[in-house]
Curated annotation (Swiss-Prot):
Entry protein name: Pteridine reductase 1
Keyword line: Methotrexate resistance, NADP, Oxidoreductase
PANTHER family the UniProt entry points to: OXIDOREDUCTASE, SHORT-CHAIN DEHYDROGENASE/REDUCTASE FAMILY (AFU_ORTHOLOGUE AFUA_5G02870), SHORT-CHAIN DEHYDROGENASE_REDUCTASE FAMILY PROTEIN
Database matches in PROSITE patterns: ADH_SHORT
Organism from which the protein derives: Leishmania tarentolae
Recorded name of the encoding gene: PTR1
InterPro entries per the UniProt record, alphabetical: NAD(P)-bd_dom_sf, Pteridine_reductase, Sc_DH/Rdtase_CS, SDR_fam
Family per record: Belongs to the short-chain dehydrogenases/reductases (SDR) family.
Length: 289
């Protein structure tokens, strides 16, 4: 089977592994052509693209960009271009979809840095230890807010500008943006204050962008998973404490359960839904410690 020239196109950030790869595969299975963004996981992204292209030729590409550090992030593509600003790097991701397929119908803002920044721990700049592998809380702030809030804002802006510019040619096209928020905006994990702040900003962006972009028939929604496919370095004690608080099944959400909601929000069945955030957390956000 080959990709139809009219197949809808989805840009998924952080698509190389874990939840992002599951979302990308689910969209591909629904007939989407996918642009797989990655930061450091080049091998994983290439493997996923090869798998998807084997199923349907010319249905997946990979594009690398650092969306996390506002001040120093880099960007590389095969042509060697190096846009400097975060907005230009975000625009380049959207442009890649148009260069390859002439359209971009869906944007999934999934890329995310995630680690604790305890308020009572001294960072390196205060004579204490570093925050994760970061040298200071200032760098952590640029990283966490860059990937979780600022880059999504710029990606939405670039996406919407392209829609506005091509509206006449793409008349009748349905557009959808899905922001991957977090159930922690309702009940934070201890020590993850800065991450929670950034995800709160993303949830606010979801509502504000939905209002502003409705005139272009761009729907903007959020999905708030609980802990799903976890990073390798998350302490087991944190995972166990989380699962203990989940009313439904006392477990993490699966990648497939989260991806199913993303697919729904991108589908015609959700054509009258915008500005909402759906929790996929087994009721975690309803509980208190």
């Amino acid at each position: 089977m080959t990709t139809s020239p009219t197949a809808p196109v989805a840009l998924v950030t952080g698509a190389a592994k874990r939840l992002g790869s599951s979302i990308a595969e689910a969209l591909h299975a629904e007939g989407y052509t996918v642009c797989l963004h990655y930061h450091r996981s080049a091998a994983d992204a290439s493997t996923l693209a090869a798998t998807l292209n084997a199923r349907r030729p010319n249905s997946a590409i990979t594009v690398q960009a650092d969306l996390s550090n506002v001040a120093t992030a880099s960007f590389s593509e095969t042509d060697g271009s190096v846009p400097v600003t975060l907005f230009s790097r975000c625009s380049a991701l959207v442009d890649a979809c148009y260069m390859h397929w002439g359209r971009c119908d869906v944007l999934v803002n999934n890329a995310s840095s995630f680690y604790p920044t305890p308020l009572l721990r001294k960072d390196a700049g205060e004579g204490g230890s570093s925050v994760g592998d970061k040298e200071s809380l200032e760098v952590a702030a640029a990283d966490l807010f860059g990937s979780n809030a600022i880059a999504p804002y710029f990606l939405i802006k670039a996406f919407a500008q392209r829609v506005a510019d091509t509206r006449a040619e793409q008349r009748g096209t349905s557009y959808s943006i899905v922001n991957m928020v977090d159930a922690m905006t309702s009940q934070p994990l201890l020590g993850y204050t800065m991450y929670t702040m950034a995800k709160e900003a993303l949830e606010g962006l979801t509502r504000s962008a939905a209002l502003e972009l409705a005139s272009l028939q761009i729907r903007v929604n959020g999905v708030s998973p609980g802990l799903s496919v976890l990073p390798d370095d998350m302490p087991f004690s944190v995972q166990e404490d989380y699962r203990r608080k989940v009313p439904l099944y006392q477990r993490n959400s699966s990648a497939e359960e989260v991806s199913d909601v993303v697919i729904f929000l991108c589908s015609p069945k959700a054509k009258y839904i915008t500005g909402t955030c759906i929790k996929v957390d087994g009721g975690y956000s309803l509980t208190r410690a």
